[in-house]
Every structure is written in structure tokens, then in C-alpha cells.
Amino acid sequence: MSKQDDMRAYLPPFLTSLKEMAELLKAEAPEFDKQNDSIFDLTDQLFVPTATWGLSRWEKILNVPRESGDTDEIRRLRLISKMSNIPPITYRAIEQAVNRFLKNPSAQVRLLPGEYRFNVDINVDDLQHMNELIEAIENMKPAHLAYTLRGGLNETLRIKDTVILNHRRYRTASELKVGYSVTLNNNEVVLT
């Protein structure tokens, strides 16, 4: 159903039969369509995930610098990261923020208590947008913590090995006698 038909449905039947009214609706329907599109476009700018030309306003409000080669998607990710930076920060919040920049959410944050630092492990296949990722971590992490960003491969390794455990009990100096062995008993256990 076109906009012209929508507008005609609001009119009483005696007006829709007039030629002048048909011409008026024909001229005004495209204008109403443009106005509706403008309204929807304007409302899209009120939300970061749907904003396009309004991203520069959001960057100004949140004090987020724009770099020359940034796409709208990167700018949105940076803004969402800044908006979701609500203290106190937990390692899970850092993990979620890092995962926003990855194709496959594979980040793992490991706290190292007593060392005042943490490790961020990311699958090598997901290493992209590194500058934005580092900037997001820097903005989120507590100032007193350091971090190490480590790329690796997340593969399960099965290690099969045999360990022989010897538990020997030796004789004391007073228990030593000629002809006796130095050990009292020798328990050997094989672990696989």
C-alpha cells in the first residue's frame, strides 16, 4: 500500500472522489515519505548502534577522538566500549570488552594476584583492530594494574607420558649392618 493510498483512507468518501484531492494527495505523498524517512533517520542518530552521521556528535559528547582511517563500525565499537566502561571493572568485563573487537570471542583474562597485573590471551586468528583493542583495555583497566596481551593458539594437547615414582626408606646409621642393603624398603609406582 502506497503512502497516497494510506492518506486517501483517512478522508471521507466524498473528498476522495474529487480530482483536486487526488492531485493534492499525489503531490503531498512523496513529501510525507521524505518527512517520515527524515524522522526515522533522526531517531537512528539517538542510539550509537544505529547512528551514522550522528557518530561525530557522540564522539564529542563522550570525548572519544576520531582517527582518519576509522570506519563507522570501528567508531561505534569505540563509543560502545567507552559507554560500557562502568566502574568497578572485573576481569569478566574486560574479557567482554575485548571480545567485542574479535571475530570469534576467544579472549581469556587471567588475573595474577600479588603481581598487580593480568594476562589477556587471544587466539592468533582473531588479532585484528589491535590499536582499538589496546585503547579499550587501557580505558577500562584500573590504573594500578599492568597487563600482557598474548596471542596464542587455542588447541587441546594430549600429553601421554610415564612417570616412575620411587619411595625409598633408608636405614639410619645405627641400623646399618654388614650384609644388609642400605634401604629398608623400595616402593616403586608407575604412573601413566
Curated annotation (Swiss-Prot):
Protein name as it appears in the record: Phage-like element PBSX protein XkdU
Organism of this sequence: Bacillus subtilis (strain 168)
Homology family: To B.subtilis YqcA.
Gene from which this protein is expressed: xkdU
